[in-house]
A protein has these predicted regions:
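Flavin-dependent oxidoreductase catalytic cores
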Residues: 1-355
Length: 355
């Protein structure tokens, strides 16, 4: 790709460089889902990124699957996120909020009235969540009915309104990593026989209904979407990822959204776990009217600079944890500070804001 450190415009929003900070769950919010002042410091420290995508943020209590993850579904959340956004903007940074519903990747402990988590179909994930006691197996989910699906679409709309009230520059719809939208998309987890199951068009309906509604709140160019076509994270897969995600990319492109964020390979793991033509996906998105392509997973400066011109933006995740000045380090070829995995989730400033 052309110079990683040049500015890049997504319509009327100009990123000062093409380095994007990936959304990273750090489990440092309050137990009620409110972001903290420490989180504001953390994001401000990383404001030299062209765009920060803030950590996955649940749109409802039902959407939560891990302890101390933030929410965006009440006025306390909005007020606390506003402080975070203000800190990033004070350093001339841009920040996007990733909207999240975990679906079946949850436990009754997190759910309203200790009820079962929800999913397109009642299939339990062979995956883990964590609370104050440590890691737990996910609970058996129940299948959503169509009225409940409409309610969740409406919750995404409210979350988008709340993000706008908190002054986020963009929002990203999290349709990857085996969470609720991904559970609808992929045929291993979606066994429905109604309007939301069966064909690729039906399995994509939930995502596209969400996109169609949130682009009434934010301009389409200020909305991104994250997918992970061949990731098996959270016990998920599809029998024909090429056909499914080409359709998804084209439909998102037709809606002229700001970017398509693609996790290449297995989330946080092997970039080459399964053969897949990502360049074709980026082309399909942009030829249909999408604005920018964003690649993610295991990128280094060398891999980024060698990337094809179909890729506009590169997302870096873990390196940003221990290198708040990652952009400068990449630009001037300075050594990167290694991260301490024991501090990735939970805790206070150690391993969070003290790098």
């Amino acid at each position: 790709m052309k110079n990683l450190f040049e500015s890049f415009s997504i319509k009327d929003l100009t990123l000062k460089n093409k380095v994007v900070m990936a959304p990273l769950t750090r489990s440092r919010a309050k137990l009620d889902g409110s972001p903290t002042d420490l989180m504001a410091t953390y994001y401000q420290q990383r404001s030299s990124a062209g765009l920060i995508i803030a950590e996955a943020t649940q749109i409802s209590q039902q959407g939560q699957g891990y302890i101390a993850t933030p929410g965006i579904y009440n006025s306390s959340h909005v007020a606390a996120w506003q402080k975070v956004v203000d800190q990033v903007h004070a350093k001339d940074g841009l920040i996007c909020l990733q909207l999240w519903h975990v679906g079946r990747i949850s436990h009754t402990d997190f759910q309203p009235n200790q009820s079962a988590p929800v999913a397109p179909s009642a299939i339990q994930a062979k995956s883990k969540v964590y609370n104050d006691k440590g890691f737990l197996d996910t609970s058996m989910p129940r299948a959503l009915d169509e009225n409940e699906i409409a309610d969740i679409v409406a919750q995404y709309v409210e979350a988008a309104k709340n993000a706008k009230q908190a002054n986020f520059d963009m929002i990203e719809i999290h349709a990857a990593n085996g969470y609720l939208i991904d559970q609808f998309l992929r045929d291993r987890t979606n066994k429905r026989s109604d309007n939301y199951g069966g064909s690729i068009e039906n399995r994509s309906r939930f995502l596209l209904e969400i996109i169609d509604r949130v682009i009434e709140i934010y301009p389409a160019a200020r909305v991104g979407c994250r997918i992970a076509p061949v990731s098996t994270f959270n016990d998920i897969s599809d029998s024909n990822p090429k056909e499914l995600f080409t359709y998804v990319a084209e439909e998102l492109g037709k809606r002229n959204i700001g970017y398509l964020h693609v996790i290449e390979g297995d989330t946080g793991g092997d970039r080459n776990n399964q053969a897949f033509d990502y360049l074709n996906l980026y082309r399909a998105f942009k030829e249909a009217g999408g604005l920018a392509s964003m690649a993610n997973n295991g990128y280094t400066k060398e891999l980024a600079e060698a990337a094809q011109d179909e890729i506009d933006l590169i997302c870096f995740g873990r390196p940003f944890i221990s290198n708040p000045d990652l952009v400068e380090k990449l630009k001037y070829n300075l050594p990167l500070t290694p991260g301490d995995e024991s501090t990735f989730y939970g805790g206070g400033e150690h391993g969070y804001t003290d790098y």
